[in-house]
Amino acid sequence: MVAPGGMRIMAAIVDRQTFILPRAVAADTEVFAIGDLHGRTDLLHALLDEAAGETRRRARRALVFLGDLVDRGPDSIGTIDLAIGAGARIGADAQIGLMGNHETMMRLALDASAPWDDALHALANWLRNGGGAVVRQFVDFEVEPAGPEELLTVIRVALPHRIRAWLETLRANWRSGNVLFVHAGVNPGVDLERFLAVPWNTPLAEVHEDMHWAWVRWPFLEASPGPGGFGGYLVVHGHTPNDARPDPSHEEQIRNFRINLDAGSGKTGLAKMAVFRGAEVKVLTALGPTNAMLSRAQG
């Protein structure tokens, strides 16, 4: 990204911390998990450069995106394009994209098989939550649409095929060993398998946030599950920036069988990646300008 005068604004890795976990990923696999990015291509470049430079220490390498690549930030389409080729860039044998609540809103609006009223409701929610920044990247409005129905039609026609195809690859969760990767978390009061089986395309009007893996915050973030963890798993998630607290502690999270990789990229200029090998995890933080700083630099 370029500031006035041609100076390039770069993101860089500014912190590395290593922890021992109460659960482990599969013994033959090293897992690179990347948290919420929200249209910050610069932060993703920094994280992928770091990942590409990591010496392989296991037979297999997997890359997991925890969701919310889109909305709010300056370059959601660029972030998706970068993510599509990220596995090859870091030498991964497998790449997994998880669906965040922002991708859920986007896909519900753009899925032609969705009931029209449900799609319009999803579109309204998506636009209220930063989706307009994405739409402006692939729709050139010579004339403003007459209403939401026309707007939805225009967006569906203009959506690039590669973006639609990427949306359709996203899944609800992924597991390696006794570590569960999911966008928002789980509900400790609900059977784990039943909770994770909730359909992604549940109409937004019917979604109860505490009962959906793309939306849950409470009671998950305040849970202390004990030595059994969450259904036997440690949970790696994003969705709630820094646990909605000013100074979150990964040590405290790990004691409660979870790790939060949402660093609040738009407001903080930070994004996180965790590298899992066995029961060890290395958490890396990339720092760039905030969205507000980028807006001032570009305009």
What are these regions (language model features)?
Residues 39-42, 71-74, 102-107, 188, ...:
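Active-site environment of divalent metal-dependent phosphoester hydrolases
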Residues 36, 68, 83, 100-101, ...:
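Divalent metal-coordination and catalytic microenvironments
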Residues 31-33, 63-65, 97-98, 180, ...:
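Residue-level marker for buried hydrophobic side chains located in beta-strands
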Residues 28, 58-61, 92-94, 177, ...:
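A general structural motif
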Residues 142-259, 264-269:
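Acidic, His/Gly-enriched loop-helix segments that form or flank divalent-metal centers
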Residues 73-171:
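Active-site neighborhood of divalent metal-dependent phosphoester bond hydrolases
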Residues 254, 258-299:
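Binuclear metal-dependent phosphoesterase catalytic core
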Residues 2-82:
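N-terminal active-site segment of His-dependent metallophosphoesterases
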